[in-house]
Amino acid sequence: MRTRLVLGLIAVSGALPGFTAADSAPIGPGDSTWAIRTVLGYTKTGGNTDNSAGNFLFHAAHVMGKWKLLFGTEALYGSTKGETTAQAWLGYLQANYDISSRFYWYVGARYDDDRFSGFAYQAALKTGAGYKIVDTDATKFTVQAGVGRRRLRPQIIVKDAVGGIVSSTEEDEETDTILDAGLALEHSFNQYTKLLAGVTVQSGQNNTLTNATVALQVKMTDRLALSAGYKLIDNSSPPPGSGRRDTLTTLGLVYELKNEKLPPDL
């Protein structure tokens, strides 16, 4: 006999890893300068298998004149038969300065820590420019590109049959110049259903880190919706013993606060 339980809680006020899109609801009375997105999900299987996984996301954005401050964190934990088989978190901070209504300059930082990726950490500082290709009530599409510097530390991990880590050995830290790029899309099919998608890439000599997300959201009330999402994380050059791709599928309840001054997340 097999049982399966899937629970999700998602609070949203933006869009994907860095920006936020539009709606008419301020975060507080008279305050339309903030937007927030929080995600909390949990999945468990029992019977022939014994797996559990939890994921957390917090994204925030704040408007200060021509400046937009974007910051957040994400985390994932998974276990199989009582052994840890997934453990990762990231944090980011980005500041955008509006040069025009569509064009902006940005500077930012990002830190990725994924115990099972083959890298103890990947930390980057970056700067570049972004452009709102489409900015309508129904569709918002933003791209950005720039350069930066990254530090990463490869590690050799040995896993057991279940997928838990038996041992890990950190190697020397590496530094490289990276190309930083991202795109974000938010499209409303109607007043109840919309699509959220985003991709970020940090590509350098030592590794190319790609994060891609897509989610379909169905509105239930002004604040609540149901969401089904998929995330892909790809490291092009992991050390021996580590695979290059990880995926996460989520189903959750969405709580949404929006800010029309903020475009979709990057």
How would you label these PLM feature ranges?
Residues 1-33, 257-266:
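Cleavable N-terminal export/targeting peptides
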Residues 34, 66-71, 102-105, 137-141, ...:
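Repeated loop/turn-to-beta-strand initiation elements of outer-membrane beta-barrel proteins
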Residues 36-38, 69-71, 105-107, 125, ...:
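Transmembrane beta-strands of outer-membrane beta-barrel proteins
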Residues 42-46, 64-66, 75-79, 111-115, ...:
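Transmembrane beta-strands of outer-membrane beta-barrel pores
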Residues 44, 60-62, 97, 111, ...:
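Residue-level signature of outer-membrane beta-barrel architecture
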Residues 44-52, 80-86, 113-121, 202-211, ...:
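Solvent-exposed loop/turn segments connecting transmembrane beta-strands
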Residues 138-225:
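Outer-membrane beta-barrel transmembrane domain signature
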Residues 216-219, 245-266:
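Outer-membrane beta-barrel "beta-signal"
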